[in-house]
Amino acid sequence: MQRAIYVRPVGIFPAPVGEDGENVWSGLPLTGQPLRFATIEIVEREGVRIARRLASVSDAFERDWGRYTLEASSLMEAITAPRARLAGLALDVPRIMGIVNVTPDSFSDGGRFSSAQVAVDHALRLAEEGADILDIGGESTRPGAETVPVEEELARVMPVIEGLRPRTQMLISIDTRKADVMRRAAAAGADILNDVSALTHDPQSLSVAAETGLPVILMHAQGDPKTMNESPRYSDVVLDVFDFLESRIDACVAAGIPKAKLVADPGIGFGKHLHHNVAVMGNLALYHGLGVPILLGASRKKLIDHISDVPLPKDRVPGSLAAALAGVAQGVQIVRVHDVAATRQALAVWRAIAHNTNKV
């Protein structure tokens, strides 16, 4: 379903640590983080017609938005409301999800961690480097990837989860599109479900996700991984992604998954060409209107090569850090990365400078 109005906070700025004021004149708080905004972009959409205008927060509250008033007000409430903890993890500061690919064909590190013990050791190393969440995946969903049979995926990820759970209290996320893998991973101690299809690939995944009671990360992707980047089409990629994620959030809530347990991922690189990815990256703050935390996964992805001519994924760390910082500056709560230590250092320096404090 297509929305009629969207609201994007712009001019986001850091709030000094300890500031308590929350009036429109000093800006409004962004999702409970030490970030504020005093200007919004109002986007009106009717079919193919899209109109955009900027307004100060104070002006927006003083004027009549006509038939959009109620809808815009609900979006503003979603943008300013603090986010619930994710499996016990507070989201008042940016959090790091470390990637553990137990696959032979991942685009970045395929085959490096394909044995269970090597993957467990790698995951524990990411935890030591500062990861808040460990994301375990046994099926590559890179462009062109083939579907992995469920038994093979289980054989890859279950020994890793079972090997990790007794050795760490770190949050464990299972990156899968399959209901059987979700169910087995949850029983083995996984804390979060991360589905690149937003619970659409497997007809049973929505009900199984609800049964587990675990938080769910819903990602936008256009098409199947094997063909998704051949010819993606959008009316407006930024708004279309919003509409898709909002529809999946509604479907989850209808299935019995509380909205407070959902996270939205706009799906950088999934059914998107460079101009699509850049547009989404530049408008991440719009997705706060969904009323759930935002996860950004741009680490080592092809868009970095397209922008800066870096063919090898392992050489894309600087571009990955730039993408992560661009995200957290727009209020993204979670960054999914390969290079945890470098990301942690970059975020610590950014926070210290942005908030004029060394309490990172």
Where does each model-flagged region fall?
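Catalytic domains of carbohydrate-active enzymes, especially glycoside hydrolases
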Residues: 121-137, 330
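Short acidic capping loops at alpha-helix termini that bridge into adjacent secondary structure
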Residues: 258-261
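Active-site-adjacent loop and "lid" segments of alpha/beta metabolic enzymes
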Residues: 1-34, 91, 107-122, 141-164, ...
